[in-house]
C-alpha cells in the first residue's frame, strides 16, 4: 500500500514538473515570438534599417514616415508592449527576464517618443534623417543589374520620403515642436552640399562610376543613363526641396525657446529624455548636483597639472594659451590623421593586459566627410553595416585645424576607437548567445559611459605622460561633467545659450568653436549629453565595489569582459550582472 502511494506521489510530482516545464517553455517561446515579430516589423517598415541589417529585399525604396504609417507604428508597438506585459516573468529563465526587461524598456521608449511627436524633429544640431543617406550605398550590394535598379528606384523614392518628413516638420511647427532657431544658423550646409548642378558632383552617383566585369557595354551604358537621371530627379530634387523648405519656412518659424521643458510635453518630456538616456531614476536636481561636484573635483586636478608645467598666470590664461599656441595644433589634415592613427596603434598593443576577449573586426581612421564636418563634433566612431566587408571607422574632424588641439587627441582616440566604441560595439556584434535585438543595441548610458571610462583606462595603459595631454584628458572629463550641469540648466532651469558657452569655455580647454557647436548639440538633443558621465560613474563605482569585495582575486580583464560580455544594457542591469559575477568569483 505504501509502495503504491509512493508510486502515485512520484507520478503526480513528475506530471506537475512536466506541466511546469511545458508552461515555462510556452512562455519562453512566446517571448521570442514577440522579439521575432518586432524585428520583422522593423525590417518591413524601415528599409534603411533592413539594408544596414543585411536584408536587401527592400533596397528599392525609402521608409514611409507619413502620419498614417506613424499611427500604424504606434498601434503595433503598443500591441507588442501589451504582449510583453502579459508574460509571466516567473516562468522565464534569469537571462530571459533580463531580455524581457531590456526589450520592454526599448518598446516603452519608442511608444513615448511617438506620443511626444519626436518624429516632428527628424534632425538635431549636427545630423539628421538626411545626413547619412549619401553613404547608404556602401551597405548595398552592386553585383547584378537588379542591384543597380534597386538603387535607382531608391533614389527616385527620395522626393516622396523627404516630402513626408517635411509634412511632419510642418505639423511640428504648427504645434510648437521644432529644433530651436538659435542652433539652426548655418545648418543649411548639411543640405546644400547635395544640391548640385550635375550628377558628376553628387555623392549619390558614386556606385555608377564602376561596374562588375560581368556587365556588357550595353548594360553599363543603360544603367549609367538611368543612374544619372535618378540622381538628379531623385536625390538632388529631394534635397533642393528640403533646402527651400528649411530656408523659407522652417528656419523663420522655428521656436525661439531653448529648453525641452518649453515643448508641449513640458517637464514630463525632459524627464522622459533623462530616463531614456541615463536608464536610471534620477531627478534633474540630483544630476545637476552630481555635475557641480565633479566639476569642482576635476578643477582641482587641473590646477595640479598647471602647477607642474610652471605656468605663470591664471586658469583662464592657461586655457587661452592652450587654445592659441601653434605648438598644440597639426599643420595639415594628414598630420592630424597620422597622429590619431599612431595613438590608435599604440593602444592596440595594450589591450591584452586589459581584456581577455578581443574582437575580430579591424577599424580604420578617416576624416569626417566634408558635408558633415563644419557642424560636427571632433570625432566619432562609425560601425560597419551588418554583412558588409567594411571595417569600423574612427572619424577625425579635420575641418578648421586651429580648433582641433593635439592635447585632446589621446583621450578622443581611446574613446572612439579602442578600448572605446569600436571594441565595445564589435564585441557585442560577436555575442552569439544574445537575441538579435541585443547584438546591435546601443543604450547611450552604457555606450558613452564605456567610452568615457575608456579614456580613464588610458592612464593604466601608460598614456597621458605629457602634462598637456593629461590636461587634455582632464578637459575631456571636465567637459562631460559640465554636460550634467548645462543640460539640466538648458532644459529645466532656463539657462541661455551664451550662459552654456561661457560655462564650457571657463571650465574646459575646448576651443571656443567646439564650445559653441557642443552647446548647440545639447540644445537640440535634450538628455543625450547626460549619458557619458552618469554611465562612467556607474562603471567606476562597480569596479571599486568589485575590487573591494574580491581583493587579490580581482582581475581587471575578467571585470572588463563581464561589463562588455552582455552587450549594451541599462545601468541597473549592469549593476545586477556585476554583483552576480562578484558572488560567483567569491565561490
Label the predicted regions.
Residues 9-12, 139:
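General helical structural elements
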Residues 22-587:
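N-terminal maturation segment of proteins
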Residues 11-20:
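Bacterial N-terminal signal peptides
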Residues 1-2, 23:
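N-terminal hydrophobic targeting signals that begin at the initiator methionine
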Residues 2-10:
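Bacterial N-terminal signal peptides that target proteins for export
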Amino acid at each position: 500500500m505504501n509502495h503504491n502511494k509512493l508510486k502515485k506521489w512520484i507520478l503526480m510530482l513528475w506530471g506537475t514538473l512536466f506541466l511546469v516545464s511545458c508552461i515555462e517553455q510556452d512562455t519562453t517561446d512566446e517571448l521570442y515570438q514577440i522579439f521575432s515579430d518586432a524585428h520583422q516589423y522593423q525590417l518591413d517598415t524601415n528599409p534603411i534599417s533592413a539594408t544596414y541589417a543585411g536584408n536587401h529585399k527592400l533596397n528599392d525604396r525609402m521608409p514611409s514616415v507619413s502620419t498614417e504609417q506613424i499611427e500604424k507604428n504606434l498601434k503595433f508597438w503598443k500591441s507588442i508592449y501589451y504582449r510583453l506585459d502579459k508574460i509571466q516573468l516567473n516562468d522565464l529563465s534569469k537571462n530571459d527576464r533580463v531580455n524581457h526587461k531590456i526589450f520592454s524598456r526599448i518598446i516603452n521608449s519608442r511608444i513615448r517618443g511617438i506620443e511626444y511627436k519626436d518624429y516632428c524633429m527628424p534632425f538635431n544640431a549636427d545630423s539628421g534623417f538626411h545626413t547619412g543617406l549619401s553613404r547608404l550605398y556602401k551597405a548595398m550590394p552592386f553585383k547584378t543589374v537588379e542591384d543597380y535598379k534597386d538603387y535607382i528606384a531608391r533614389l527616385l523614392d527620395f522626393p516622396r520620403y523627404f516630402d513626408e518628413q517635411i509634412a511632419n516638420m510642418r505639423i511640428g511647427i504648427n504645434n510648437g515642436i521644432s529644433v530651436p532657431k538659435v542652433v539652426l544658423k548655418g545648418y543649411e550646409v548639411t543640405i546644400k552640399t547635395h544640391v548640385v548642378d550635375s550628377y558628376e558632383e553628387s555623392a549619390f552617383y558614386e556606385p555608377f562610376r564602376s561596374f562588375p566585369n560581368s556587365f556588357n557595354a550595353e548594360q553599363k551604358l543603360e544603367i549609367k543613363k538611368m543612374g544619372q537621371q535618378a540622381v538628379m530627379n531623385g536625390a538632388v530634387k529631394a534635397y533642393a526641396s528640403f533646402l527651400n523648405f528649411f530656408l523659407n519656412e522652417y528656419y523663420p518659424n522655428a521656436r525661439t525657446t531653448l529648453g525641452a521643458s518649453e515643448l508641449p510635453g513640458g517637464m514630463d518630456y525632459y524627464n522622459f529624455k533623462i530616463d531614456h538616456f541615463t536608464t536610471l531614476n534620477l531627478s534633474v536636481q540630483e544630476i545637476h548636483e552630481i555635475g557641480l561636484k565633479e566639476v569642482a573635483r576635476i578643477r582641482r586636478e587641473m590646477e595640479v597639472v598647471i602647477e607642474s608645467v610652471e605656468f605663470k598666470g591664471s586658469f583662464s590664461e592657461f586655457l587661452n594659451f592652450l587654445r592659441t599656441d601653434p605648438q598644440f595644433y597639426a599643420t595639415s589634415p594628414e598630420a592630424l590623421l597620422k597622429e590619431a592613427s599612431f595613438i590608435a596603434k599604440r593602444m592596440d598593443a595594450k589591450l591584452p593586459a586589459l581584456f581577455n576577449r578581443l574582437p575580430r573586426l579591424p577599424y580604420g581612421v578617416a576624416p569626417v566627410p566634408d558635408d558633415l564636418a563644419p557642424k560636427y563634433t571632433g570625432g566619432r566612431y562609425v560601425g560597419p553595416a551588418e554583412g558588409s566587408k567594411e571595417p569600423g571607422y574612427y572619424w577625425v574632424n579635420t575641418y578648421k585645424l586651429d580648433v582641433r588641439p593635439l592635447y585632446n587627441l589621446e583621450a578622443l582616440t581611446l574613446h572612439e576607437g579602442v578600448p572605446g566604441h569600436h571594441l565595445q560595439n564589435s564585441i557585442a556584434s560577436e555575442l552569439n548567445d544574445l537575441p538579435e535585438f541585443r547584438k546591435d543595441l546601443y543604450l547611450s548610458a552604457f555606450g558613452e559611459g564605456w567610452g568615457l571610462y575608456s579614456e580613464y583606462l588610458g592612464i593604466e595603459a601608460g598614456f597621458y605622460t605629457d602634462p598637456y595631454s593629461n590636461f587634455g584628458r582632464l578637459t575631456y572629463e571636465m567637459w562631460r561633467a559640465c554636460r550634467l550641469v548645462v543640460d539640466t540648466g538648458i532644459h529645466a532651469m532656463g539657462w541661455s545659450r551664451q550662459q552654456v558657452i561661457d560655462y564650457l569655455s571657463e571650465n574646459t580647454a575646448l576651443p571656443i568653436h567646439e564650445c559653441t557647436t557642443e552647446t548647440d548639440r545639447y540644445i537640440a538633443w535634450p538628455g543625450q549629453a547626460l549619458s557619458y558621465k552618469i554611465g562612467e560613474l556607474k562603471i567606476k563605482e562597480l569596479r571599486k565595489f568589485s575590487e573591494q569585495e574580491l581583493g587579490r582575486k580581482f582581475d581587471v580583464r575578467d571585470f572588463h569582459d563581464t561589463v562588455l560580455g552582455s552587450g549594451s544594457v541599462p545601468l541597473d542591469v549592469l549593476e545586477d550582472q556585476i554583483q552576480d559575477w562578484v558572488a560567483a568569483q567569491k565561490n
